[in-house]
């Protein structure tokens, strides 16, 4: 009986550690993306230029801030669902 209990406890500890680790990694990645977005103003400028537009700095900043607001809203909306 002691061997069975030890095996069950080892399996439960392993599963708990795996789930806890996945949770912590997910939170860390979300924080990293919130602090350092993958898209910057230079990428927006390149994107607008690739579409045949000659982007002004005001247009670049407008599009960049719009994208950042959408990302923050999506992140907040995702947190509400949980």
From Swiss-Prot:
Location relative to the cell: Cell membrane
Keyword GTP-binding: no
Kinase listed as a keyword: no
Keyword line: Cell membrane, Membrane, Transmembrane, Transmembrane helix
Bilayer-crossing regions: 5-25
Main location: membrane
Family designation: Belongs to the UPF0154 family.
UniProt name for this protein: UPF0154 protein SPD_1662
């Amino acid at each position: 009986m002691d061997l069975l209990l030890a095996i069950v406890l080892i399996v439960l500890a392993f599963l708990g550690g795996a789930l806890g680790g996945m949770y912590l990694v997910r939170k860390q990645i979300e924080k990293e993306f919130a602090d350092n977005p993958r898209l910057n103003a230079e990428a927006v400028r390149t994107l607008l230029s690739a579409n045949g537009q000659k982007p002004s700095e005001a247009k670049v900043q407008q599009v960049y801030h719009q994208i950042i607001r959408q990302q923050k809203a999506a992140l907040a909306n995702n947190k509400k669902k949980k």
